[in-house]
């Protein structure tokens, strides 16, 4: 989980911006989107195979 400490003279906007950046770097949102619905292991293998094939092109 992403965690930041807000400085004394730091505005809420800048703290929120830092928090969002840290969340995107750690992959929290993408992981939550993946886990929103259950993905069967066979579907996961198919998806990874197609991603691998597409990345080679």
From Swiss-Prot:
Pfam families: Ribosomal_S21 (PF01165)
UniProt superkingdom: Bacteria
Keyword Acetylation: no
Annotated Basic residues bias: 33-57
GO biological process: translation
One GO CC annotation: ribosome
Record PROSITE patterns: RIBOSOMAL_S21
Classification via InterPro entries: Ribosomal_bS21, Ribosomal_bS21_CS, Ribosomal_bS21_sf
Region of interest called Disordered, as start-end residue ranges on this chain: 22-57
Record keywords, A-Z: Ribonucleoprotein, Ribosomal protein
HAMAP family: Ribosomal_bS21
Similarity annotation: Belongs to the bacterial ribosomal protein bS21 family.
Protein name, UniProt field: Small ribosomal subunit protein bS21
Originating species: Natranaerobius thermophilus (strain ATCC BAA-1301 / DSM 18059 / JW/NM-WN-LF)
Gene label: rpsU
